[in-house]
Swiss-Prot record:
Organism: Rhizobium leguminosarum bv. trifolii (strain WSM2304)
Source species taxonomy: Bacteria, Pseudomonadati, Pseudomonadota, Alphaproteobacteria, Hyphomicrobiales
Record GO cellular component, one term: cytosol
Domain of life according to the entry: Bacteria
InterPro entries: AlgH-like
Protein name stated in the entry: UPF0301 protein Rleg2_0617
Family as reported in the entry's similarity comment: Belongs to the UPF0301 (AlgH) family.
Amino acid sequence: MSLSTLKNRRERGFFDGQFLIAMPGIEDRNFARTVIYICAHSDAGAMGFVINRPQSLTFTDVLLHLDMIKQEDQIVLPQRARDFPIQTGGPVESGRGFVLHSDDYSSDSSIPVSDDICLTATLDIVRAISKGDGPTRATMLLGYSSWGAGQLENEVVNNGWLTCPANEELIFDRSLDDKYERALAGMGVTAAMLSAEAGHA
């Protein structure tokens, strides 16, 4: 599923607003030990963002790359902008930035993905954040994760993923190191329990 499909969707799918939590059997380095927030799911496929993978780029790097600021301007950026988190959202269009954010910011290009969360993938939100005028809660993700028709359903049936309702606090939490464990804890399980279960499968 692509961003254009997300824009044009009419109905919410079964996995919309869910977390996917990778089972130990997933060895693909793009998805091992990941937590993915599913933004859209339909008969055409699914789209979401990994929310626990750091990115080496900083928000200042992004602004410099986009020629929004000059090297000497970075010292006058609001502290909130300098600290703004950048993460790796997935392997598809990995050079493109997407901002998941609270619904207190909206532009013509913002797409609601839940009652409280929107997705914006245009420069207007980057400018707003750089000036300290952006949404209260947000994170920028480079790239996204995508599944074709029936692919995600098949992976879930084959025990590739655990699923549970998404938690907004976890989506925007900047502490990434233990986010996988905390997502599992929200379901009452641990990584050790999953590994033991996989060993007996």
